[in-house]
Regions:
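A helix-boundary/kink motif common to multi-pass secondary transporters
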Residues: 6-7, 63-67, 140, 197-201
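Membrane-interface helix termini and inter-helical loops of multi-pass transporters
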Residues: 30-38, 86-101, 190-200
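Small-residue-rich hydrophobic segments that form or flank transmembrane alpha-helices
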Residues: 1-56, 110-113, 117-190, 194, ...
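Short, aromatic-rich membrane-interface segments at the entry and exit
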Residues: 37-40, 68, 129, 199-204
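Juxtamembrane cytosolic amphipathic helices that cap and anchor the N-termini
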Residues: 104-109
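Loop-to-transmembrane alpha-helix initiation sites
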Residues: 152, 197-209
């Protein structure tokens, strides 16, 4: 809007500038649930990184408009199921308190995060879908934070960021502004989230998922096939 950064440099500037705040929030939230199962956390992070590299070529050929409509429907349903869990309505059970996954649930988490990592290459964010995935698989809501933030941090630090820097497709001044301002914001957000009760945290996740679902719908209608 302010034209402070050349349009061509915006994607690289966003990726490079946000890498520092995202990495900081990942390490802060790694200790958010101290007893979170390392196998679950590492498996999901590795799956997202692998998806970014291996599935990117596949998902880049997907019809973006159809993907956005599908994600709108999926996220809306997931958010509704989570809301029912919070309110104790229907046959969906209660919000889980597990700190790790095993067996079929772990496989589902790995496969889902693999494709979420791939979808990052066409501009589909990983945060909200990963949050919903963790909650629906029965993990403690707090476990969603290290899982989703760790996945994005490693994707940006070892994936897109270095590529944009190598090609010089970023604005250094804007990146430093993002890095410093974002880092301060992350610290403030961490302490706010840390003070929330499980119920409040879960309701916040539900709200984020509903908002994200309608953003997918908006992008499907307005952007169509555009990135």
């Amino acid at each position: 809007m302010t034209k402070s950064v050349d349009d061509v440099l915006i994607p690289g500037t966003l990726n490079v500038g946000d890498t520092v705040p995202v990495c900081i929030e990942a390490f802060l939230f790694f200790d958010f649930v101290p007893d979170m199962d390392l196998l679950t956390l590492i498996s999901m992070i590795v799956a997202s990184i692998a998806g970014a590299y291996l599935a990117a070529g596949i998902v880049s050929r997907f019809n973006r408009k159809k993907v956005r409509y599908a994600l709108f429907v999926g996220m809306f349903i997931l958010a509704t199921v989570m809301l029912c869990k919070v309110l104790g309505v229907g046959p969906f059970g209660e919000i889980g308190t597990a700190t790790g996954l095993r067996g079929v649930k772990l496989i589902i988490a790995i496969v889902a995060n693999f494709f979420l990592g791939g979808l990052m290459s066409i501009g589909v964010g990983l945060y909200a879908p990963c949050m919903a995935l963790c909650v629906l698989l029965g993990l403690d809501t707090g476990c969603a934070f290290p899982a989703m933030m760790g996945s994005c941090a490693y994707l940006m630090a070892f994936g897109n960021g270095p590529k944009f820097i190598q090609e010089g497709r970023y604005d250094p001044v804007a990146c430093w502004t993002q890095a410093i301002g974002g880092a301060v914001g992350v610290f403030l957000a961490f302490f706010i989230v840390k003070s929330m009760s499980l119920r409040t945290l879960t309701i916040m996740v539900v709200c984020v998922c509903y908002l994200t679902s309608f953003l997918f719908l908006h992008d499907a209608i307005k952007k169509g096939e555009a990135a």
